[in-house]
Amino acid sequence: MRKQDEEILGTYFRLEEYQKQRLRFERLLHPEQFKWSGPTPTMSATKKIKLAELEKIGFGESFYRRMADGEKAARKELEDLAENHPLWEYIKPIRGFAKYLAGAFIAAGGDIERPATASAFWKGMGLDVLADGTVPRRTRGDKQTTRRIPAFPHVTRIGEQIRQQMLRQNPCYQELYHRHKADYQARYPERPKMFAHKHGLRIAQKILYAALWEKWRQACGLPAPFPYVFDILKHDSGRRFTIEDFYSKPG
């Protein structure tokens, strides 16, 4: 793995751990900072005892403050690293893709030297399909999803963050989502609407990731061939989607 990408991955893991601990103790020490469906829970006698014991072993207010400060510092470090990454110049114009999300995406992508094709990159990012072309998903009666090598948990979490942000803010991503969602509903009208929703999200994300994979490889001086034409990567005009399609248009 390239040293710059390794630094980003390490910083992301540190940020994630700071955030996890901060949220854990924020819920215990400062429940008023959360949005509750009802009134803020009161401090029970049991919780008071728990907090007192946690304080004795160093997990009190001072620990919470350290985690909150560490989270802010790690986030700033991740954003700075992302801004100095060669992929940033291609990500910067994408509406909905701020510096934090760019750093998180690079952390999820990991070693860009390994996936020599867009489909290999999709697999590492948890967007692969099974041999029959279906999406890995649980079926009733099965305990595990059929997938040879599942994506890392942090890759899945980052993918969800990217989907949410892009669907809210990026016009090209929104258009791709709605188009492929409608196409799925037309082909499988008997299936649950959630399947169509997830299909639209998945295809839009695969198109975005393929474009980012190409620029990332090229920015690092690596070949980025498309050995065959992916139908879903085609624009209405017949050309393949590129990262520029996701850029904010003037006016």
At which residue positions do the language-model features occur?
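Surface-exposed helix-capping loop/turn segments at secondary-structure junctions
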Residues: 34, 77-84, 217-224
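Long, charge-rich intrinsically disordered scaffolds of nucleic-acid metabolism proteins
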Residues: 1-81
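Coiled-coil termination/hinge junctions
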Residues: 72-110
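Short, hydrophobic/amphipathic alpha-helical patches that form generic packing surfaces
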Residues: 7-27, 31, 103-108, 157-165, ...
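Phosphate-backbone recognition surface of nucleic-acid-processing proteins
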Residues: 90-93, 104-198, 202, 215
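Alpha-helix boundary/N-cap detector
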Residues: 13, 55-58, 62, 69, ...
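Long, contiguous secondary-structure blocks with strong helical propensity
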Residues: 41-49, 79-91, 143, 243-250
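Acidic, carboxylate-rich catalytic segments that either coordinate divalent cations
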Residues: 169-251
